[in-house]
């Protein structure tokens, strides 16, 4: 009987996002005869309707261990405040002191708990889901354990020289979700032999949602052109640029019948709603909040917009392409890898609101362009980004000894 690898999957995230969905798609399909996986999270976070990640994992036969995170203690807060006062003359010194305090109260205890779980569970591999900067305690635990460590880098990483040194010393392999993410790793000094790319992917055979049904639910007429975006309402997603561009579009085409549907939740929601009011487009913008089935909402769109400052390889772009919805995206890592400008979608330089507005205009006014972009993108996603390729690619890395 072949050796079954016993894997502890560490995810330090606090909310349900695209990386969570990609992880779940892998776990649903991974070969259980070869890989015995237990998840270790810092929070049993939930989706909008209350279903927790633990419940979803239990439904597919994957156990979950939660390491509860305590609030920052008073002594740590006071130490940081004292450090800021005493080290007022040096920003770098203040940052270093703050980090030292965080290591004492947060990182070291987590390292100890991960190390204990790993030993008690008899695991042979620590597999981490996100990026090195948010998985640092995993690297430190693996160093103590001298364990095999696989990093799945799902977004464009933020790397510092000390972090790169840690990665180079202790990582066995780093899986990048796009060639762009791998390029960023290499540019920051991560050893080339550690890096490999396994493209994010989607299930191209999944049932497709009913476009008309969701439009009726949102009270959107058939003749209304729907722009839309899906994702956390956070600064990195740059939805404020999208609203600015839509205001320009609306001024240029006051006769246009359109809506903008923002699917997602986050700290920017109130500011975005106020921005829409200030721009005079509040009646055109629909905030749905977080949704368990964003794919159903995506089907209502006539054009999908992703204006992010950075991405890994956004699954939602692949899903839009599968639904024959043309994509307008910022020219950043990940997104630009999926879109060949004017062939499989439209690109604009990040933060270039005028060019984004022009792209909105082009998609809205030119039905032939819309159809051509959507058809080419559909062919590309079916040929290159099928979920089977993603699963086999990750299995090959996890199974290599």
Please place each PLM-identified region on the residue numbering.
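A conserved, positively charged/aromatic
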Residues: 143-144, 149-179
């Amino acid at each position: 009987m072949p050796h079954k690898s016993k894997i502890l999957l560490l995810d330090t995230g606090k909310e349900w996002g695209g990386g969570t969905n990609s992880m779940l798609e892998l776990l649903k399909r991974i070969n259980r005869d070869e890989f015995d996986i237990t998840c270790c999270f810092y929070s049993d976070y939930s989706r909008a309707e209350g279903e927790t990640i633990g419940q979803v994992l239990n439904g597919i036969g994957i156990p979950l261990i939660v390491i509860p995170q305590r609030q920052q203690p008073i002594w740590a807060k006071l130490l940081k405040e004292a450090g800021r006062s005493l080290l007022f003359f040096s920003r770098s010194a203040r940052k270093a002191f703050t980090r030292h305090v965080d290591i004492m109260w947060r990182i070291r205890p987590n390292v100890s708990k991960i190390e204990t779980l790993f030993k008690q569970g008899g695991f042979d591999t620590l597999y981490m889901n996100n990026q090195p900067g948010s998985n640092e305690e995993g690297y430190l635990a693996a160093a103590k354990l001298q364990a095999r460590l696989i990093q799945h880098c799902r977004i464009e990483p933020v790397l510092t020289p000390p972090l790169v040194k840690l990665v180079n010393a202790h990582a066995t392999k780093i899986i990048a979700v796009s060639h762009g993410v791998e390029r960023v790793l290499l540019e920051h000094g991560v050893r080339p032999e550690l890096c490999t790319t396994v493209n994010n992917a989607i299930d191209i055979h999944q049932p497709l949602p009913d476009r008309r049904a969701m439009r009726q639910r949102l009270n959107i007429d058939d003749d209304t052109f729907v722009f839309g975006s899906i994702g956390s309402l956070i600064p990195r997603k740059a939805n404020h640029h999208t609203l600015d561009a839509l205001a320009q579009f609306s001024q240029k085409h006051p006769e246009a019948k359109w809506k903008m549907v923002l699917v997602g939740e986050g700290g920017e929601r109130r500011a975005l709603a106020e921005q829409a009011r200030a721009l005079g487009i509040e009646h055109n913008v629909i905030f749905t909040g977080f949704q368990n089935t964003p794919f159903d909402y995506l089907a209502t769109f006539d054009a999908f917009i992703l204006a992010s400052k950075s991405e890994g390889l956004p699954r939602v772009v692949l899903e839009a392409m599968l639904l024959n919805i043309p994509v307008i995206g910022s020219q950043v890592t990940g997104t630009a890898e999926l879109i060949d400008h004017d062939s499989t979608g439209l690109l604009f330089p990040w933060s270039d609101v005028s060019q984004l507005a022009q792209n909105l205009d082009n998609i809205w006014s030119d039905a032939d362009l819309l159809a051509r972009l959507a058809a080419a993108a559909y062919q590309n996603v079916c040929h290159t980004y099928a979920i089977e390729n993603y699963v086999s690619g990750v299995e090959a890395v996890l199974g290599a000894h």
